[in-house]
């Protein structure tokens, strides 16, 4: 993208480190501009607009090609996925059909399938549920991935709740 946009004075591509969480709007603004967006602020208050690549593509298709948004790219990943990768998916396709077209699950199958990411996603218990424009990923986990957690150094102080940029409460996961 840097190469493709090098002649565009109003576009800057800034590659980011693979780090979680870094995809949420407030984190993207902070890491790219250094501007903090406080709880009662909107990105526009900091002079920023953050658009998802999928949204930008849908707007382009609608405005320039006069075509409705009927597909999106979904990431199918996790140790239970036979062929983890990104797939172009038509809205309404069931998760079962999607998994089948994507090569299915590994032999031992999936213990848990999450729609979305590991922190903010939700469990899928019926694979006949259709994909929608908000479907972004399927995380397919093996038994080992979701096995009971081992004792850890956590002392249940709650500090993680105070500092989590995604406002996640780990004890509720």
Language-model features and meaning:
Residues 2-95, 101-106, 117:
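Hydrophobic alpha-helical positions that pack around
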Residues 28-32, 104-161:
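Active-site gating/interface segments in enzymes
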Residues 78-79, 154-155, 170:
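Short acidic (Asp/Glu) and glycine-rich catalytic loops that position anionic groups and cofactors
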Residues 84-88, 150, 162-163:
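Short, surface-exposed loop/turn motifs that are enriched in glycine and acidic residues
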Residues 96-97, 162:
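Short alpha-helical basic/polar micro-motif
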Residues 159-173:
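Iron-sulfur cluster-binding cysteine motifs and their immediate structural context
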């Amino acid at each position: 993208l840097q190469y493709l946009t090098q002649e565009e004075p109003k576009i800057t591509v800034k590659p980011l480190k693979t780090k979680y969480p870094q995809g949420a709007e407030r984190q993207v603004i902070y890491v790219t501009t250094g501007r903090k967006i406080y709880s009662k602020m909107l990105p526009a208050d900091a002079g920023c607009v953050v658009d998802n690549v999928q949204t930008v593509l849908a707007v382009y298709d609608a405005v320039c090609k006069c075509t409705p948004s009927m597909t999106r790219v979904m990431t199918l990943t996790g140790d239970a996925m036979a062929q983890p990768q990104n797939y172009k998916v038509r809205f309404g396709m069931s998760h079962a059909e999607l998994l089948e077209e994507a090569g299915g699950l590994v032999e031992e199958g999936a213990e848990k399938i999450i729609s979305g990411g590991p922190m903010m996603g939700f469990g899928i218990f019926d694979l006949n549920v259709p994909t929608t424009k908000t479907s972004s990923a399927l995380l397919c986990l093996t038994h080992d991935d979701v096995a009971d957690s081992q004792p850890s150094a956590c002392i249940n102080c709650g500090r993680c709740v105070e500092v989590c940029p995604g406002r996640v409460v780990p004890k509720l996961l």
